[in-house]
Amino acid sequence: MAEERSVSRIDELRQRIDDIDERLVELLSKRAACALAIGHEKKLIGLEVYQPSREAEVLGHVQRINPGPLDNEAMKRLFERIIDEARRLERVADTDEQAG
């Protein structure tokens, strides 16, 4: 009986994770669209894709607002990866404009 409750609770928690993952994908896609637009704007005004001060600002911000349970280093690593992908999209925007 306790085992059934535990299995049921695990299933419930997994469903919550699936729901959260769907929201994360949606939000990451919106963030990526913004990065692509930023890439276009940077190209228009001649800015470099890589902006170390902005990256430091973003990483500092996410660490300040981090409520846990992930520690700040884990959060930083996650956002470094997100930023890497955003930078890749900005470069794609730059390349697309040069090709077009």
Predicted regions and their residues:
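Domain-level signature for soluble enzymes in the chorismate/prephenate branch of the shikimate pathway
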Residues: M1-G100
